[in-house]
């Protein structure tokens, strides 16, 4: 059996909500893929003045993405730096904490409960792209190739950069760890250089966590929000395959326009976007992945 269905699953699961400073819609669609391996979080006002959103694109199974979806916010709230409003460090530490939890006996047991097939959980992992909004500051922590794009003055202000093995800095680390990059893949296998999980690539006891073949340490980008900032578009890589960032923002803006933004309007914008991105067939390979997007409208 190949990676694709004979017909796509177009049904969408969409959640909407709002907080003091945001309105959001999170929508996911399995599409042409045999299984759904994406997960996401949406937590407006987890504490006063803080909202958190995240997308997790699984590979090698759905289990790590589901694990992170369940545990990320709880671990972030427990984090000492989070409590001291040191959000950049808190995000980094929470990404690394996910790997720590996955390595525990309890974590391994939970992964097995999530598994859809009898696969080796050591090769399961997920990307993580998490946006934290604190008052007028936006932080985006990223490991992998999911993305966040801020619509600023109706143009794209990119809040993350993909972590690919061919990137010179990433490639140097991989080679220092004893690995190689072939066809854009770590050891010829994984097409990401940073991810949560993927524990088989993180087993060299002589190396620190940020020196392994694959690392969970995210980049964190920070920006001060202005009245010109309209919304954040978050998504797994399947959302970004066929249209560039400016085209994606234009598509969302064509739905919400200058109207009073509501949960229902954002729901329509998110679902319409996924419909447009879905390929009519699998011949080209793009528009065929699982798709998850979160639209976070900023109340200014």
From Swiss-Prot:
Membrane topology per record: Peripheral membrane protein
SUPFAM superfamilies in the record: PP2C-like (SSF81606)
Posttranslational modification: The N-terminus is blocked.
Catalytic activity: O-phospho-L-seryl-[protein] + H2O = L-seryl-[protein] + phosphate; O-phospho-L-threonyl-[protein] + H2O = L-threonyl-[protein] + phosphate
Positions annotated to bind Mn(2+) 2: 57, 237, 289
Keywords: Hydrolase, Magnesium, Manganese, Membrane, Metal-binding, Protein phosphatase
Residue ranges of every copy of the PPM-type phosphatase domain listed in the record: 23-298
GO molecular function ontology, one term from the record: metal ion binding
Cofactor binding remark: Binds 2 magnesium or manganese ions per subunit.
Example GO BP: signal transduction
Function: Serine and threonine phosphatase.
Family: Belongs to the PP2C family.
Record-given protein name: Protein phosphatase 2C 1
């Amino acid at each position: 059996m190949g990676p694709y269905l004979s017909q796509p699953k177009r049904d969408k699961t969409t959640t909407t909500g709002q907080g003091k400073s945001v309105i959001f819609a999170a929508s996911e669609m399995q599409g042409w893929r045999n299984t759904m391996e994406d997960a996401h979080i949406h937590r407006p006002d987890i504490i006063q003045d803080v909202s958190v959103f995240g997308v997790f694109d699984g590979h090698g199974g759905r289990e790590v993405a589901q694990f992170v979806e369940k545990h990320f916010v709880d671990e972030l709230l427990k984090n000492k730096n989070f409590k001291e409003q040191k959000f950049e460090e808190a995000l980094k530490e929470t990404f690394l904490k996910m790997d720590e939890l996955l390595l525990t006996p309890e974590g391994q047991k939970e992964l097995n409960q999530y598994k859809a097939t009898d696969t080796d959980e050591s090769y399961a992992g997920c990307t993580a792209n998490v946006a934290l909004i604190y008052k007028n500051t936006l932080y985006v922590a990223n490991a992998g190739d999911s993305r966040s794009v801020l619509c600023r003055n109706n143009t794209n202000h990119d809040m993350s950069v993909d972590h690919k093995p061919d990137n010179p800095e990433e490639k140097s680390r991989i080679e220092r760890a004893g690995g190689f990059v072939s066809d854009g893949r770590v050891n010829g296998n994984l097409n990401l250089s940073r991810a949560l999980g993927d524990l088989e690539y993180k087993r060299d006891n002589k190396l620190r966590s940020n020196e392994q073949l694959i690392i969970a340490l995210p980049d964190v980008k920070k920006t001060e929000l202005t009245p010109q900032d309209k919304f954040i578009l978050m998504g797994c890589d399947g959302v970004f395959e066929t249209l560039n960032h400016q085209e994606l923002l234009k598509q969302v803006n064509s739905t919400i326009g200058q109207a009073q933004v509501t949960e229902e309007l954002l729901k329509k914008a998110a679902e319409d976007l996924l419909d447009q991105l879905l390929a009519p067939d699998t011949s080209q390979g793009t528009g065929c992945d699982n798709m998850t997007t979160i639209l976070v409208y900023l109340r200014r």
